[in-house]
Amino acid sequence: FMLKAPMYQAPNAVENANQPALGFKQILIIAKNHKPFIWLALGFLVCGFQVVFLGIHLPGYLTDHGFSTTTGTIFLALVGLFNIVGTYTAGWLGDKYSKPKLLMWLYGLRGLAIIAFLSLPLSTWTIYSFAIIMGILWLSTVPLTNGIVANMFGVKYLTMLSGIVFFTHQVGSFFGGWLGGLNHDITGNYNIIWAMTIALSVFGVLVHFFV
């Protein structure tokens, strides 16, 4: 039941091809007043925070625990490889099932994967398994998020509206990278940021109830 797909209707104010082209300010006003769009953008902020924190700081986390830089490099390579599989699969599933509910599953699985990774003893097996799982979940949010934007407003202004959503992703990316480094400089570990990534997974699940 969690994956039954609803149908979205594009608002005529945006999609009507017979209307004159809207400017950026007008599109921004329409988006600002569309609450599900705001929730979607906030959810994408979570994605940016998590992937940049892991992409930048996971190799350092492994080095702190006695693993070689090669292990961190292989981790990133596996993430990149399985990201291809995950992104393609997410796009395929998004054509068949509810995109917001799929995003809820993705953020929830990210949180569970992080909890499992932190709970299990660190070994090359757990590191590479985590890399594969996170690779599948890495940017699988992108086709689903863009698909929701298209369902909300139609495709006429998809590039502009997706760019607005992606801006929040980049805000999250900044804080994922910056806070990770700041926290490590102050405390010598990433414990607070790990807790934040888990909490943000819960937030990511909750906000997509309203999309």
Report residues per predicted region.
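C-terminal membrane-cytosol helix-exit motif in multi-pass small-molecule transporters
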Residues: 1-16, 207-211
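Paired intracellular helix-loop junctions of major facilitator superfamily
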Residues: 149-158, 188
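C-terminal transmembrane helical hairpin of 12-TM major facilitator-type secondary transporters
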Residues: 79-83, 89-148
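Loop-to-transmembrane helix entry/capping segments in MFS-fold secondary transporters
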Residues: 69-70, 155-165
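Interfacial helix-cap and linker-helix signal at transmembrane-aqueous boundaries
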Residues: 62-63, 93-94, 179-188
